[in-house]
């Protein structure tokens, strides 16, 4: 190795120690397959990608093994892609602002609105036949509500037949295509005037306010059917609350790297918690579960989700494409393909539409709501609708010195006294976040598009009387 290069460890993706023995699992209706941890090849140091000045150093196995991410100050062009943070049992080390490191947006369009163009797929890694499975399952006695939620829903037959006015369709098509008599500019201006007429109707057409209460009641019923177990971590033999916090913080970075929607993050965390509620996972595979949950959520929510190779890359190829796809398959099996779940984000958006607030209050409510994702305890014991109400109250009090308006109390059925326990927990998380090592959410909301709401001083106390 050249002496001009410092030893640099590219980020790996293991949470915890090395060389764990994986538990096997066999369950009814689930595939009998295994996953294999990628071993460290040697203790020697390698030079990787000398043009970018990055050195890949491997370390010996051991309980005290740790990895550090830095960059050599050689002045060469930065690498074309950015590998996200390293997950370990002791903490997360990642590239930070202020070290002269530029985060590179790879391939995705603005707000994930355009399909990737000119992408080069990463080469598939060879997969060896793994010996044992990395999961163990425990089955709790299902309650009657759980049995009902897992039953197969029969499809509904559409008995109503709607007639199509073909004359109108033909006239519209003739209007758009008859360029001999109408110039393209006139067509564009006509379409523009039509869109202005539609927009003049306001947001009631889109928000279907006449059905808002029915939609809300349906979501309130659905959130009970799809909530994870509040204290599932007590049954996990090899992972802890801290490891889950590190994983969720990393998922926030993944969402920012690929400019995914906020709802995608909430769905991924819901899938993760529901999976861990009935499956025990070893720490070496926890990030694989989280990555598969994010992949599945992005497929469900995004117009142009990142490709599988992108998710393999962000784990620094710790897991192969085949492993990730198999984990996605297992995740769908465990979730019974039930992916349409109400989240805190959905309820919060309903509250914000129902009760108009300023943009700063809206962004602050979204910020404190995302903070609830970091901690399974205590927030999993609260329903998403209640967490959203607490986030609204906390943001409204911070900016406007008011808590819970009467309009939302009537709409949601929640009184302020019912919100107070969750509000107190959320306020505590709001006060503690500047001192925590997991800063991805706080860094996200430091951006100007969110009006830098994470830099606002939280209220020291909540005057609830």
Curated annotation (Swiss-Prot):
Keywords: Cell cycle, Cell division, Cyclin, Mitosis, Nucleus, Ubl conjugation
Cellular component annotations (GO), alphabetically ordered: cyclin A1-CDK1 complex; cyclin A1-CDK2 complex; cyclin A2-CDK2 complex; cytoplasm; cytosol; microtubule cytoskeleton; microtubule organizing center; nucleoplasm
Tissues expressing the protein: Very high levels in testis and very low levels in brain. Also found in myeloid leukemia cell lines.
Main location: nucleus
Reported modifications of this chain: Polyubiquitinated via 'Lys-11'-linked ubiquitin by the anaphase-promoting complex (APC/C), leading to its degradation by the proteasome. Deubiquitinated and stabilized by USP37 enables entry into S phase. Ubiquitinated during the G1 phase by the SCF(FBXO31) complex, leading to its proteasomal degradation.
CDD domains (alphabetical): CYCLIN_CCNA1_rpt1 (cd20560), CYCLIN_CCNA1_rpt2 (cd20563)
Cellular compartments annotated: Nucleus
GO terms for MF: cyclin-dependent protein serine/threonine kinase regulator activity
Single GO BP term: male meiosis I
Subunit organization: Interacts with the CDK2 and the CDC2 protein kinases to form a serine/threonine kinase holoenzyme complex. The cyclin subunit imparts substrate specificity to the complex. Does not bind CDK4 and CDK5 (in vitro). The cyclin A1-CDK2 complex interacts with transcription factor E2F-1 and RB proteins. Found in a complex with CDK2, CABLES1 and CCNE1. Interacts with INCA1. Interacts with KLHDC9.
Recorded family membership: Belongs to the cyclin family. Cyclin AB subfamily.
PANTHER family: CYCLINS
Role summary: May be involved in the control of the cell cycle at the G1/S (start) and G2/M (mitosis) transitions. May primarily function in the control of the germline meiotic cell cycle and additionally in the control of mitotic cell cycle in some somatic cells.
Protein name, entry field: Cyclin-A1
Annotated source species: Homo sapiens (Human)
Gene name, Swiss-Prot/TrEMBL: CCNA1
């Amino acid at each position: 190795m050249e002496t001009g290069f410092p030893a640099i460890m590219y980020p790996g993706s293991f949470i915890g120690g090395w060389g764990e023995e994986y538990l096997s699992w066999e369950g009814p209706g689930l595939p009998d397959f295994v996953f294999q941890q990628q071993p460290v090849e040697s203790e020697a140091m390698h030079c990787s990608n000398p043009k970018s000045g990055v050195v890949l150093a491997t370390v010996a196995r051991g309980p005290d093994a740790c990895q550090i991410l830095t960059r050599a100050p050689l002045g060469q062009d930065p690498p074309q892609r950015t590998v996200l943070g390293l997950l370990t049992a002791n903490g997360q080390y990642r590239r930070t602002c202020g070290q002269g490191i530029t985060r590179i947006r790879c391939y995705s369009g603005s707000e994930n609105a355009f399909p990737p163009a000119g992408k080069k797929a990463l080469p598939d890694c060879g997969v060896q036949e793994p010996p044992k499975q990395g999961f163990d399952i425990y089955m709790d006695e299902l309650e009657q509500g759980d049995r009902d939620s897992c039953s197969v829903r029969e499809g509904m037959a559409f008995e109503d037949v709607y007639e199509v006015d073909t004359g109108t369709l033909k006239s519209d098509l003739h209007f758009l295509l008859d360029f001999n008599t109408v110039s393209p500019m006139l067509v564009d201006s006509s379409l523009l005037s039509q869109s202005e007429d539609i927009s003049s109707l306001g947001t009631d057409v889109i928000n279907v306010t006449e059905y808002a209460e029915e939609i809300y009641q349906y979501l309130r019923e659905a959130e009970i059917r799809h909530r994870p177990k509040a204290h599932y971590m007590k049954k996990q033999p090899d992972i802890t609350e801290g490891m889950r916090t590190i994983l969720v913080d990393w998922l926030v970075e993944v969402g920012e790297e690929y400019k995914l929607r906020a709802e995608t993050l909430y769905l991924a965390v819901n899938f993760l918690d529901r999976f861990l509620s009935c499956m025990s996972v070893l720490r070496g595979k926890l990030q694989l579960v989280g990555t598969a949950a994010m992949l599945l959520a992005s497929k469900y929510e995004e117009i142009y989700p990142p490709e599988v190779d992108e998710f393999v890359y962000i784990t620094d190829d710790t897991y192969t494409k085949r492993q990730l796809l198999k984990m996605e398959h297992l995740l769908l099996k465990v979730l019974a393909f039930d992916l349409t779940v109400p989240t805190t984000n959905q309820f919060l958006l309903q509250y914000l539409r129902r009760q108009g607030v300023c943009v700063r209050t809206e962004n602050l409510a979204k910020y404190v709501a995302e903070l609830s994702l970091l901690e399974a305890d205590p927030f999993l014991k609260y329903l998403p609708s209640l967490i959203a109400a607490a986030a609204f109250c906390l943001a409204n009090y911070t900016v406007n010195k008011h808590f819970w308006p009467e309009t939302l109390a009537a709409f949601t059925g929640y009184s302020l006294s019912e919100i107070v326990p969750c509000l107190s927990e959320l306020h505590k998380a709001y006060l503690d976040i500047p001192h925590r090592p997991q800063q991805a959410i706080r860094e996200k909301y430091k951006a100007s598009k969110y009006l830098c709401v994470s830099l606002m001083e939280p209220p020291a106390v909540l005057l609830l009387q």
